[in-house]
């Protein structure tokens, strides 16, 4: 079987899920191709704009999603859908040139382009969408994939309410790499991380981009720490956040 995984650079979570599926499929002897939507240049441009808006003007990002959510439905498409559909021609040529048997996408934008191709009668290859959010973000309801992998069953009601067909929803979780299945002794892990073996440790994570007011949360945690308690913060690729934490 020849499989295409289609992602986009708006945070590493989507790409990580795609790579995890790719790793599992390769172990089972499947041929895989991992592609960024629109190619590296377009993907990085879209991803860069997305990340800049989310990091620096989150209120504007929230407004865009709220307005889009009001417009979007299973029968009415949003401006986001039509913007993504501009990549349909390029993707159609790529799919036809490589004759894929199956397409998987961990990203909404790619799912919208594939939906556009399907509705134009240009796509007969089955499409599986992989959700990486623990909520139903706007615009999934305007996609038309053959199958949706959902992070957990508690999301089913929300997704169905938005208009996604129940028979296409499968709560199988978010794919992760094989490395997460490797069990290690806690004492060795603590030693590797240079943490006391008997201490209480609070882990703070906010995605690959280091979202949110993490520095304020950490400052409050540190203020209330006991003598045998530590805070470990995963900053992702947010160097500014790391610098702020190192100086506090």
Segments the model singles out, each with a brief description of its role:
Residues 26-30, 119-124, 163-164, 223-228, ...:
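Short helix-capping segments at alpha-helix termini
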Residues 12, 67-163, 168-171:
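Active-site and donor-binding regions of nucleotide-sugar-utilizing enzymes
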Residues 7-19, 212:
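A short, glycine/small-residue-rich beta-strand->loop->alpha-helix junction that serves as a flexible
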Residues 196-248:
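Donor-nucleotide binding loops and adjacent catalytic segments primarily
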């Amino acid at each position: 079987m020849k499989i295409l995984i289609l992602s986009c650079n708006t945070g590493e979570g989507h790409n990580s899920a795609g790579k995890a599926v790719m790793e599992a499929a390769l172990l089972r002897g499947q041929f895989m191709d991992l592609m960024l939507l629109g190619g590296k240049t377009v993907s990085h441009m879209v991803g860069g704009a997305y990340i800049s808006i989310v990091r620096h003007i989150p209120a504007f990002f929230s407004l865009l999603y709220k307005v889009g959510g009001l417009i979007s439905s299973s029968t009415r498409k949003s401006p986001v859908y039509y913007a993504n559909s501009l990549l349909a021609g390029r993707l159609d040529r790529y799919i036809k040139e490589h004759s894929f048997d199956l397409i998987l996408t961990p990203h909404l934008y790619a799912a919208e382009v594939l939906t556009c191709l399907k509705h134009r009668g240009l796509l007969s290859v089955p499409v599986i969408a992989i959700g990486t959010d623990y909520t139903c973000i706007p615009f999934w309801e305007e996609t038309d994939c053959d199958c949706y992998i959902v992070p957990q069953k508690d999301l089913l009601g929300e997704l169905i309410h938005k208009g996604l067909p129940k028979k296409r929803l499968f709560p199988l979780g978010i794919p992760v790499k094989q490395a997460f299945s490797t069990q290690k002794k806690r004492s060795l892990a603590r030693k590797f991380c240079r943490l006391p073996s008997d201490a209480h440790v609070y882990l703070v994570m906010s995605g690959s981009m280091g979202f949110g007011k993490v520095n304020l949360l950490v400052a409050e945690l540190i203020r209330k720490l006991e003598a045998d308690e530590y805070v470990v913060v995963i900053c992702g690729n947010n160097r500014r956040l790391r610098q702020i934490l190192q100086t506090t």
